[in-house]
Amino acid sequence: MILDDEEDILTLYSNFLSSLGHRILSSYVNADSILQDIDIEPPDIYIIDYRLPNNMNGVEVAIEILKKFPSALIIFITGYEMLEKELSKHDIFCDKRIDVLIKPIKLNRIQDSLLSLLSK
């Protein structure tokens, strides 16, 4: 599952990962939508942007995901350079398989992160 507030970024990530043989279950532009569908079919990995519209950010979404699926794999892709420091403030992220990619990134970095998390 991919969560980013920019539809063109969702399309870019989806097309790239699909071209590498990954199946994208769904993509979302806001936190409310992904949380409504959280029980439908848990993905192998979540790709989440930090800055989101409305009232939740990516960390808050990830917390809800980890409450439901403690072993979920999460990649944050963000321009927010202090994200790792923010994650360290929440015990729920301790000993989890999480990666933080700081924008701008090359697309192959997403694939590298995904493969690294899946192999842990």
Which role fits each region the language model picked out?
Residues 6-26:
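Two-component/phosphorelay signaling modules centered on CheY-like receiver
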